[in-house]
């Protein structure tokens, strides 16, 4: 009878330690959760505003904006005057 109580208490201690480890690992995950990863790889691709350097038209904000080469030879986001 005493051995069963000792075994039960030992199991209870192991269960409490296990649950504390699980709670601690959820608090400080080893692998960052997607919502915490905004610093290196943001989910939303940020678009570039007017006169920002660009490489493709889809980098620019707005439907009427496009990436075009200016007089200085650099590609920048511009709003098309006909549509914008």
Curated annotation (Swiss-Prot):
Signal peptide: 1-25
Disulfide topology: 47-61, 54-67, 60-77
Cellular component, GO annotation: extracellular region; nematocyst
Organism superkingdom: Eukaryota
UniProt entry tagged with the keyword Signal: yes
Entry keyword set: Cleavage on pair of basic residues, Disulfide bond, Knottin, Nematocyst, Secreted, Signal
Expression tissues: No specific localization in a particular morphological structure, with a slightly higher expression in the epidermis structures (column and pedal disk), consistent with this peptide having a role in predator deterrence.
Subcellular location: Secreted; Nematocyst
Removed propeptide positions: 26-46
Primary residence: secreted
Function of the protein: Toxin with activity against pain receptors. The recombinant protein (which contains an additional Gly at the N-terminus) at 100 nM shows >50% inhibition of the transient receptor potential subfamily V member 1 (hTRPV1) and slight (~10%) inhibition of transient receptor potential subfamily A member 1 (hTRPA1). Is inactive against voltage-gated sodium channels and the human voltage-gated proton channel. In vivo, is not toxic to insect, since it does not possess cytotoxic activity when assessed against Drosophila melanogaster flies.
UniProt domain comment: The presence of a 'disulfide through disulfide knot' structurally defines this protein as a knottin.
Note: Negative results: does not show activity on human Kv1.2/KCNA2, Nav1.3/SCN3A, Nav1.4/SCN4A, Nav1.5/SCN5A, Nav1.7/SCN9A, and the human voltage-gated proton channel HVCN1.
Protein name: U-isophellitoxin-Tst2
Protein species of origin: Telmatactis stephensoni
Taxonomic path: Eukaryota, Metazoa, Cnidaria, Anthozoa, Hexacorallia
């Amino acid at each position: 009878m005493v051995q069963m109580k000792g075994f039960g208490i030992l199991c209870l201690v192991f269960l409490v330690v296990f649950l504390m480890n699980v709670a601690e690992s959820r608090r400080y995950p080893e692998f960052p959760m997607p919502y915490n990863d905004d610093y290196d790889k943001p989910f939303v691709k940020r678009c570039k505003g007017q006169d920002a350097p660009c490489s493709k038209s889809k980098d620019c904000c707005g439907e009427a904006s496009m990436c075009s080469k200016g007089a200085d030879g650099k590609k920048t986001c511009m709003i098309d005057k006909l549509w914008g």
